[in-house]
Amino acid sequence: MKMTAKETILQGKAVLGIEFGSTRIKAILIDEKSNPIAQGSHEWENQLVDGLWTYSIDAIWQGLQECYTDLRRDVKEQYDCEVENLAAIGFSAMMHGYMAFNKTGQILVPFRTWRNTNTAEAAAKLSELFVFNIPLRWSISHLYQCILDNDAHVKDIDFITTLAGYIHWQVTGEKVLGIGDASGMLPIDSNCLDYDTKMVEKFNRLVSSYNYPWKLENILPKVLVAGDNAGYLTPEGAALIDISGHLKAGIPVCPPEGDAGTGMVATNAVKKRTGNVSAGTSSFSMIVLEKELSKPYEMIDMVTTPNGNAVAMVHCNNCTSDLNAWINLFNEYNKLFGIEMDMNKLYGTLYRHALEGDADSGGLISYNYISGEPITGLSEGRPLFVRSSTDKFSLANFIRCHLNASVGVLNIGNDILFNEEHVQVDRITAHGGLFKTPEVGQRILAAAIKTPISVMETAGEGGAWGIALLAAFMANNVQKLSLEDYLEKEVFYGNRGTEIQPTTEEIEGFNKYISNYKSCLKVEHAAVETKR
């Protein structure tokens, strides 16, 4: 007999996932079939303190408590009951950054988030030393930059971790990290499912002259993979989450993960030859590889799935913000003439109209650079629209050129994977704001990366659902399936989403667009140099 959602909660068989995003903390409660049955959220913002982006320790715990209180409220309203016991819990958060603690568990400097770019010197030196692309936002870049800057706190370090790792440690007492999140601290060896020992040794030799009382391997969290037990909720941990006191200690907790890994899980993209694209304010693509790349590339970050498979990630700072600004301009026009129109209708109408334009957007070009874009060599950005007098200047082409621009940098990064490394992919699943209007964003992306693109209804549930699925995989995987098979058979069975294949005309049109885009990049560089 099928259990109701209320019975699932009362019998302690629900699973909880909580993810700390950059602007929102979200909690999702799922039933034994992995369906969301309740949720809560809390908005928060980073602060710029002494030139560095951070969230305070107080904001982290207040945010978690507010989010959980909102979840309790939803459970009470829907089912008139309290959450007391759970089958499992999982925590995830934005990856990378730097949280350093001393022997007594005190944080030594304010949490430095992934957004900080003060680590250029360290990242460049480590990339050369490791013969591996080390991005600015990775934890090892932050640590080494602190060393290069002679920061006094470094000698007192006992433990460094990520935001998800910190929360997990505080509520379970375990200094561990899921392999996907760990891969954003320091490179991972997918063969042994642990940090790359050669790189650890190289780092220790590099900093040996400083005579610190620690070795790198002793201050990093222990690496765990999906399905591992990562500890149990302590009484103190339960009180930190649920200020009402209803939540009980002893609940098993899965390895804490990063937002890249939970995004892969939420889109069923952890299997080799699959991938996913997230496209909103910023964008990234992640392709699960069959074999290692032949060499490092500055525009490709190597991370892993939550079960340790190697993943090539292309990250773009800009995606839909400039496009949104143009749509808002059309909304302003509507208001000026007294036209009342819902924003969803405005987006949908303009996006659909864009498909009536030319595949190459009639020669029109847009650079959507609200901020800098490392892949195209820009440390700053200036949103720019460029056309010549002979281009086909129409509304459809104008919107299409901005849609093309939203995935232009993704195209440039992924061309390396497909053209130079000959990476094979069977399925890419897309999620994010760009795909809210059915078919349009999907078609544009399919043409840009020359691959069929699927969109699933559930992908909108995002990372909190992804970490809930990982917690369920640990607690409910009675058949001992691999993570790939568990997701395929227990979660996504029969849900392939809607797939769109790019046409030859669309691919050729986008190729023409991106050729124009690349040849005119000098205009964007000039705009950055001259427009203040």
What are these regions (language model features)?
Residues 41, 113, 499:
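Conserved beta-strand positions that form and line the central face of beta-propeller blades
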Residues 76-113, 133-135, 168-180, 184-189, ...:
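Short beta-strand-loop/turn "lid" adjacent to the catalytic site in phosphate-handling enzymes
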Residues 22-24, 113, 135, 300:
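Intrinsically disordered, low-complexity sequence elements enriched in Ser/Thr/Gly/Pro
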Residues 116:
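Carbohydrate-associated surface elements
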Residues 1-110, 124-125, 156, 217, ...:
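N-terminal glycine/serine-rich phosphate-binding loop of ATP-dependent small-molecule kinases
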